[in-house]
């Protein structure tokens, strides 16, 4: 049976299914599933707060993928809304699992530092970023991820951009981006302290020439 796939902008009603996709991909280490969901929700809320473009994939009526990108100026009302959502979720995380929340915040702080280091290694880093690409495991192989990524790149081009970048790592399917034409511009291996904070073995910055 051929699946029916619809692509459209993100709606707030998509928040829970998109968070579930993010959780299944990157937030399942804790034995507390409620905490895992909150952690994924905080991560996803942050991505929404820094993004200006969204596209979700709906397969047979079910949200199965999302891409976010950042180009130009953000709508500060929308950005502030999602930043507040992230803040509120982290407060809930601290109430149910304070130690895990502290560990998560340390992870985020360390990841930001590593990302900033990667950017420093690439003085010509483009201003436009693919901030998130996540697809449900149940629909991988249908080409959903490729269509979503192409939509984000087309948006960057339509906004006048000529290249884009993204962060990825060894905990992600980074080879996918290479197959889509992205080039590795910088890499950094995690040290022992960073690995203790659950950082991936190696982090990367990839860029894509949209004129190629």
Question: Each predicted region: which residue ranges?
Answer:
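Conserved acetyl-CoA-binding loop-helix of GNAT-fold acetyltransferases
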Residues: 135, 141-154, 179
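Conserved beta-strand-loop-alpha-helix junction that forms the acyl-donor binding cleft
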Residues: 131-140, 165-175, 191-194
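Active-site rim helix/loop that mediates acceptor-substrate recognition in acyltransferases
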Residues: 32-60, 64, 68, 89-92, ...
């Amino acid at each position: 049976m051929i699946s029916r796939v619809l692509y459209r902008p993100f709606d707030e009603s998509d928040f829970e299914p998109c968070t579930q996709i993010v959780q299944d991909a990157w937030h399942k280490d804790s034995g507390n599933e409620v905490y895992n969901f909150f952690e994924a929700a905080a991560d996803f809320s942050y991505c929404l707060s820094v993004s200006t473009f969204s596209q979700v994939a709906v397969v047979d009526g079910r949200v199965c993928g999302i891409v976010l990108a950042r180009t130009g100026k953000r709508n500060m009302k929308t950005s502030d809304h999602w930043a507040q959502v992230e803040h509120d979720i982290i407060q809930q995380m601290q109430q149910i699992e304070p130690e895990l929340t502290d560990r998560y915040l340390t992870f985020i702080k360390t990841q930001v530092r590593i990302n900033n280091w990667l950017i420093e290694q690439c003085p010509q880093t483009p201003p436009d970023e693919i901030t998130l690409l996540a697809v449900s495991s149940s629909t991988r192989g249908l080409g959903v991820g490729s269509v979503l990524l192409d939509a984000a790149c087309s948006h960057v081009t339509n906004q006048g951009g000529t290249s884009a970048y993204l962060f990825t790592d060894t905990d992600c399917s980074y080879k996918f981006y290479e197959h889509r034409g992205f080039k590795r511009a910088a890499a950094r291996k995690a040290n022992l302290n960073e690995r203790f904070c659950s950082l991936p073995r190696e982090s990367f910055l990839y860029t894509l020439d949209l004129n190629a």
